[in-house]
């Protein structure tokens, strides 16, 4: 049985396109894999705090002096999040574009799971990812058009960032279901959502037909 972690990060609730897309992606995945165990994380409702002196305990070397009660509590949050991430075979992540990047809540989650010795390690030859073997499907929602021009691509630090950071963790199978131009009129929005539906079927069917050994780390 594979484990799927469903993550939403949009602050728009029921008005969110990325939430709509992640729900559809998960439904399509479960249709192909009915026995999949699904966990859900809503970062807009339950976001870890941004990194601070109090939440950096997991980065301290062994033998460091006893941590404060607050540091221990923050460490427990980081440990729960990185363990949940590492246990997942498939992740479906809603990542709307906010001000050319991702929501700060999603960045806070990434900062908690980016742990040396857990999701990556440093070697004499450079960093090595430790979270390989996963499939990650990102629901990307954008008000404008960024993928159709060099200027737009240069402004986009959403999909490119996620591909980079998950690649750093060792994840090579990162897929995107994109709906862009959502704020450019009703016709453009309808076309974007229709294209996303086609992409959902293509991406979940493609991922679902990988060998099970690839899907189960």
Curated annotation (Swiss-Prot):
Q: Which reaction does it catalyse?
A: 2 a quinone + NADH + H(+) = 2 a 1,4-benzosemiquinone + NAD(+); N,N-dimethyl-1,4-phenylenediamine + anthranilate + 2 NAD(+) = 2-(4-dimethylaminophenyl)diazenylbenzoate + 2 NADH + 2 H(+)
Q: Name one Pfam family in it.
A: Flavodoxin_2
Q: Which Gene3D superfamilies match?
A: 3.40.50.360
Q: Required cofactors, per record?
A: FMN
Q: Does the keyword Oxidoreductase apply?
A: yes
Q: Which residues form a coiled coil?
A: none
Does DNA damage appear among the keywords? no
Q: Where does FMN bind?
A: 10, 16-18
Give the GO molecular function terms.
Answer: electron transfer activity; FMN binding; oxidoreductase activity, acting on NAD(P)H as acceptor; oxidoreductase activity, acting on NAD(P)H, quinone or similar compound as acceptor
On the tree of life, the source organism's domain of life is Bacteria
Q: How is the cofactor bound?
A: Binds 1 FMN per subunit.
List S-S links within the chain.
none
Keywords from the named record:
Flavoprotein, FMN, NAD, Oxidoreductase
- The EC number of this protein is 1.6.5.-, 1.7.1.17
Quaternary structure and interacting proteins, as annotated? Homodimer.
Family per UniProt?
Belongs to the azoreductase type 1 family.
- Reported function: Quinone reductase that provides resistance to thiol-specific stress caused by electrophilic quinones.
Name of the protein this chain belongs to: FMN-dependent NADH:quinone oxidoreductase
């Amino acid at each position: 049985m594979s484990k799927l972690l469903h993550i939403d990060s949009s602050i728009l609730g029921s008005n969110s396109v990325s939430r709509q897309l992640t729900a559809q992606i998960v439904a399509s995945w479960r249709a192909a894999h009915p026995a999949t165990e699904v966990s859900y994380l809503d970062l807009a409702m339950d976001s870890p705090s941004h990194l601070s002196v109090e939440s950096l305990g997991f980065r301290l070397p062994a033998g460091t002096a006893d941590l404060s009660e607050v540091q221990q509590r923050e460490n427990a949050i980081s440990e729960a999040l990185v363990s949940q991430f590492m246990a997942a075979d498939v992740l479906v992540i809603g990542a709307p574009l906010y001000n050319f990047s991702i929501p700060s809540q999603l960045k806070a989650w990434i900062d908690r799971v980016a742990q040396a010795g857990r999701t990556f390690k440093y070697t004499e030859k450079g960093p090595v990812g430790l979270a390989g073997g996963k499939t990650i499907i990102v629901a990307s929602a954008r008000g404008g058009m960024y993928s159709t021009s060099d200027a737009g691509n240069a402004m986009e630090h959403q999909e490119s960032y996620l591909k980079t950071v998950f690649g750093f963790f060792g994840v090579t199978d990162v897929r995107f279901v994109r709906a862009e131009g959502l704020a450019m009129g009703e016709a453009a929005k309808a076309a974007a959502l229709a294209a996303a539906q086609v992409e959902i079927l293509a991406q979940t069917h493609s991922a679902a037909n990988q060998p099970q050994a690839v899907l189960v780390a």
